[in-house]
Amino acid sequence: MFVDCTASADIAFKYMNLFKRGYSVVACNKITISAPYKHYTALKEAAIEIGATLRYETTVGAALPILESISRSVHSGDEIVRIEAVLSGTLNYIFSNYAGGEGGTFAEVVKRAQDAGYTEPDPRLDLSGRDVLRKLLILSREAGVGIDEKDVEISPLLPAEFFEGDVDAFYAKLAENEAMFAARYAEAASKGLRQRFVASLVKDSSAPFGYRAKIGLESIDSTHPLFNLCGTDNAALIQTDFYPSPLVIQGAGAGAYQTASGVLNDIIM
């Protein structure tokens, strides 16, 4: 058994060789599972042919059984109708704590998240939405939808210019544009809405692969299950043909203990 708890691309792309040497793989490394679909399918097929096991529940939502629930639905003959999910504890912390400048500017809330250890060492990685994109690819593929990055509609949280320069320059850009963040917040709050960075996969016969996939900031009302999601929690709503009232999975989507327990469960399985 080989356990990959890194974020290394070098290690992630050695899984095929590990299979050939008789190892099964448990991974919380998202890189190879969200790689181009051609590589992903080759990896899965190789594991089956060789008789190895590849498990990666913790790549999405730490120990939350999001991927397992999707997989069980599909394997039972059910069909996914809609998945809506908040998959970044960092972004959820930021948007559940930012109040239009009251209690701190957007830049200050991001810095608090970094100081608390909720962000990557470089917080730009979190605010780029890249991590959420990878997680959406993984859960979509688990649902049997073979999408790549180009198939996802991406509404960037921040303009590309925010990511030029170093981290200090990034924080300076956030501070300079506080009025933009405050206006976004005020517009949503005036309608009784809250902002959440949402990843979704929705059945749509007119879309490629029969599903529409997107990530972006959304304003949701009080009837939505994601409305009261707070702190660093993740949540996923899974609606299927058999379950038109969606299954809601919610809880800590990150953390050393949570991730370790998920990895251990994959090892045992």
Could you tell me what each predicted segment is?
Residues 25-26:
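A short hydrophobic/small-residue beta-strand
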Residues 48-51, 55-116, 126-132, 137-138:
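Rossmann-like NAD(P)H-binding beta-loop-alpha module
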Residues 38, 61, 65, 104-108, ...:
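Conserved active-site and cofactor/substrate-binding residues in soluble primary-metabolism enzymes
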Residues 82-84, 92-95, 99, 112, ...:
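Catalytic, metal-anchored helix/loop core of enzyme active sites in primary metabolism
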Residues 56-60, 84, 99, 122-130, ...:
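Hydrophobic alpha-helical scaffolding
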Residues 2-3:
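N-terminal Rossmann-like NAD(P) cofactor-binding module of classical short-chain dehydrogenase/reductase
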Residues 107-228:
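Substrate-binding/catalytic subdomain of NAD(P)-dependent oxidoreductase enzymes
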Residues 8-21, 30-57, 62-73:
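Rossmann-fold NAD(P)-binding glycine/threonine-rich loop
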